[in-house]
Structure formats: C-alpha cells, structure tokens
C-alpha cells in the first residue's frame, strides 16, 4: 500500500502544475525545515524557525549538538523518506497556504504575520504555533493507508491525507485568531455548533476549490448519510434537550472528532454538530448575504439563539 502513496500525490502534482500556469496564483514562503535538517543544511542557530521547531522536540537550550542529535533521530530517519515520496517539494503547501492567506485578506480576516515551515516530528499536533512560527508536520498527511497510522482508529486516519492539509491550515489559522470565547450560561451547545459552522464556512471560503465533504472531514458515504438524515438528527438534538445545554462535555460530544455521535443517532458520524452548525449558518447567509466572516466569528454573532431564529432553519 505504501507504494500507492506517490500515486496519491500524482493528482496533486497535476493540480499544482495547472495552478502554476496561472500567474496570479499567490504562493506563501514556506521553509522546508525537515528537508534541510535531513540533508544536513541546518539554518543558523539564530533562525527563528529553527529555534521554534527545536522547542517542540526538546526542552534543552539550542546548541549545535542538540540539532545534530535530532538529525539522527528516529523521527527524521523514518518519516523523511516517506514525506519526500508524497510531497516532492513545498509547492503544494506553499500554494495552498498562499491561496488561503490571500482569500483571508480579501475577506477582511485579521491574521497575524507569521513564518511558515514544514517539519516532521513525533508530536500529535499536525499544525502547531510556536510564537510567530506556524509549523506544519507533513508526517501527519501521508495517506489514510499509511502503515504508520495503522494503530489509529479509522476516523482519525481519514483525516491524514494530503487533501486534508489545506483545510487544516485554514482552520488552524482562523481558529487561533478567532477562538470560541463564550463562558458560563452563554456557552451553549447551540453557540458552539454555530461557531463550528462558521469555521466550516471559513474553510469553504478560504481554501481554493473547496469541497464541503473535505472541509468537514467526511467521506462521500458519510455526506450522503448526513444529507438523508439531517431532519432526524436535528429532531434528536431538540428531543434530547441538547441545544441549550451548557455542559462543555455535551458540546464536545457533538462537535469534537470521534467515531460517532451516539447521543444523537447511533450511526451519526463524529462532529455531526459541526455539520448542523454549518447548515444553520448557510441558511442564515441565504437571507443575510452581506454578513462577513469577521462578524460571524465574533462572540456577539454566535451567542444566544438569534442566528438560529433569523436563519429560519427548519428540518
């Protein structure tokens, strides 16, 4: 199965080649730090990117000896060849990130200026912010059938593909700058669902050529199930009195990654609350097309039930 991974990337190469013929396609500057380290071309110790990365793999002060030790680490020796077989260069990441940042600026989102680098490491985070640096761990995107992911549950492996990378980049950038910020009685499951719906709308707006199933992390079969059962899902949320529940655990059960959301429907895929939130936000935008992403990402927007009422969402 590992030999199939270059074929997965082949379609990405073709897509990038087509994009490269468009002179107006923005490209972000991305430092291929993992590649530099593997090749022994380590940036100067004053490098902001290198310092940020080494803080994620060691608590020791940065020294040439520490970098050399990391260069011979198992993570570098195991992941680097596999990453190189899927991502032959930084073009895919650079173009994806460039398009996202350009669209974010056009949409009026205030994202801080950062440096960007691709890395490999053994941490669980696929995207990590360290001070002003955004680290993208490419060893998290080697394909759902990658042998190194075999011990992970299926629902997690489905998001470990090159196609998922742009959506993760967009969500990380937006959610870090516009986090969910309600507390106490205002932090209802409904408000969290709407916020997650806005995040999904943001990904659809920022990622070039976005697909809803990919933005939500669902297979085609899961998307069909959700579309066919949306009404029963919504009625179950209402019937079980989950909508205005202020327990953080209830909201997490609805929107956090998981194999299923049995509290709603035994067959409901994980994060079903995010799907319903997106449907509510889409209904709202149908009647309020002038609403902007910065407005919708503010707590004043997703607080209370006004968005639900004004969306006239019915199922």
Task: Locate predicted features.
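C-terminal soluble interaction/assembly domains
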Residues: 247-315
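Structured segments of extracytoplasmic/periplasmic soluble domains
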Residues: 36-40, 103, 107-110, 205-209, ...
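Sec-dependent signal peptide recognition
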Residues: 2-7
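Acidic/His-rich structured neighborhood in mature extracellular/periplasmic domains
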Residues: 74-223, 293-294, 298
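N-terminal mature-domain "stem" immediately C-terminal to a signal peptide or N-terminal signal-anchor/transmembrane
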Residues: 17-78
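C-terminal motif of bacterial Sec signal peptides marking the signal peptidase cleavage site
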Residues: 12-15
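Residue-level recognition of alpha-helix termini/interfacial anchor residues
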Residues: 46-60, 224-233, 240, 288
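Acidic/His/Gly-enriched intrinsically disordered linker/tail segments
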Residues: 200-261
């Amino acid at each position: 199965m590992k030999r199939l991974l270059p074929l997965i990337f082949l379609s990405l190469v073709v897509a990038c080649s087509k994009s490269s013929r468009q002179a107006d396609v923005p490209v972000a500057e991305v430092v291929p730090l993992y590649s530099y380290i593997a090749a022994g071309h380590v940036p100067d110790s004053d490098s902001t990117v290198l310092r940020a990365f080494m803080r994620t793999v060691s608590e020791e002060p940065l020294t040439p000896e520490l970098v050399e030790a990391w260069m011979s680490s198992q993570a570098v020796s195991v992941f680097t060849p596999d990453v190189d077989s899927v991502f032959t260069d930084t073009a895919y990441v650079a173009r994806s990130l460039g398009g996202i940042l350009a669209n974010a600026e056009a949409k009026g989102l205030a994202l801080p200026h950062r440096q960007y680098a691709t890395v490999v490491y053994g941490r669980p985070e696929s995207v990590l912010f360290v001070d002003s640096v955004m680290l993208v761990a490419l060893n998290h995107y080697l394909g759902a059938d990658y042998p190194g992911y075999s011990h992970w549950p299926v629902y997690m492996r489905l998001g470990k593909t090159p196609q998922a990378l742009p959506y993760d980049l967009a969500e990380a950038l937006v959610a870090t700058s516009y986090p969910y910020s309600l507390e106490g009685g205002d932090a209802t499951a409904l408000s969290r669902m709407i916020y997650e719906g806005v995040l999904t709308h943001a990904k659809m707006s920022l990622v070039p050529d976005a697909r809803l199933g990919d933005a939500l992390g669902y297979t085609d079969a899961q998307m069909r199930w959700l579309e066919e059962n949306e009404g029963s899902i919504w009625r179950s949320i209402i019937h079980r009195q989950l909508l205005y529940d202020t327990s953080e655990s209830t909201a997490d059960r609805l929107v956090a990654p998981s194999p299923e959301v049995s509290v709603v429907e035994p067959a409901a895929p994980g994060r079903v609350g995010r799907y319903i939130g997106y449907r509510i936000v889409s209904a709202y935008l149908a009647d309020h097309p002038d609403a902007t992403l910065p407005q919708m990402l503010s707590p004043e927007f997703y607080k209370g039930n006004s968005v639900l009422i004004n969306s006239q969402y019915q199922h």
